[in-house]
């Protein structure tokens, strides 16, 4: 698995992820880029789960963004509908964390589109560790979104054997 974290604070939204890819209990690659920019750099997205599955979902999600002129929520709902109802897509095993200047969402293969409390997203095998760390930092410090993401991923990388310290981090200005 992996760890993906998204934090929104003080006019910034940041998504970061580690770079480890495993096959069973063997590390196959340590520098996978699991976070990327989509739709003319107006959306950032990260994935946890199967790499090939996630790349397929990124492509489909970008098409949905194009169809809906970059409207994140509409594109996410349409992707989730297709993911849940299409026989081939249903077999894809991944979670997506996506954000634009207005919203942060989790998209699942069960057809769920979730806007989490406090715009804090943490998915993947190290998600619970990263979420706890990020939440503590959000509630008890004034540090910026990028620093929170970096620290949360660092803690997850120290604890979760499926998460490393090779990070990819993307950020956008936020209205929320």
Swiss-Prot record:
Record-level GO BP terms: proteolysis involved in protein catabolic process
Annotated Na(+) binding sites: 157, 160, 163
PROSITE patterns on file: PROTEASOME_BETA_2
Any Gene Ontology CC annotation: proteasome core complex
Catalytic activity: ATP-dependent cleavage of peptide bonds with broad specificity
Keyword Membrane: no
Domain of life the protein comes from: Bacteria
Pfam families referenced in this protein's UniProt entry, alphabetically: Proteasome
Locations listed in the record: Cytoplasm
Enzyme class, UniProt record, top EC level: hydrolase
Residues passing through the membrane, by range: none
Chief subcellular location: cytoplasm
CDD domains documented for this protein: protease_HslV (cd01913)
Enzyme Commission (EC) number: 3.4.25.2
Family note: Belongs to the peptidase T1B family. HslV subfamily.
PANTHER family with a match to the protein in the record: ATP-DEPENDENT PROTEASE SUBUNIT HSLV, METALLOPROTEASE TLDD
Role description: Protease subunit of a proteasome-like degradation complex believed to be a general protein degrading machinery.
NCBIfam families: ATP_dep_HslV, PRK05456.1
Name of this protein: ATP-dependent protease subunit HslV
Species assigned in the record: Erwinia tasmaniensis (strain DSM 17950 / CFBP 7177 / CIP 109463 / NCPPB 4357 / Et1/99)
């Amino acid at each position: 698995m992996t760890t993906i974290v998204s934090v929104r604070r003080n006019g910034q939204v940041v998504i970061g992820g580690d770079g480890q890819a495993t096959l069973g209990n063997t590390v196959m690659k340590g520098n996978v880029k699991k976070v990327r920019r989509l739709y003319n750099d107006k959306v950032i997205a990260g994935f946890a789960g199967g790499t090939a599955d996630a790349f397929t979902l990124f492509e489909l999600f970008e098409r949905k963004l194009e169809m809906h002129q970059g409207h994140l929520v509409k594109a996410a709902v349409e992707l989730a509908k297709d993911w849940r109802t299409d026989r081939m897509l249903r077999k894809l095993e991944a979670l997506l964390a996506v954000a634009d200047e207005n919203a942060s969402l989790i998209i699942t293969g069960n057809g769920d589109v979730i806007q989490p409390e406090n715009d804090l997203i943490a998915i993947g095998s190290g998600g619970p560790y990263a979420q706890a760390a990020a939440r503590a930092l959000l509630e008890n410090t004034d540090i910026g979104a990028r620093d929170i993401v970096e620290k949360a991923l660092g803690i997850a990388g120290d604890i979760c054997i499926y998460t490393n310290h090779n990070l990819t981090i993307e950020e956008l200005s936020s209205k929320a």
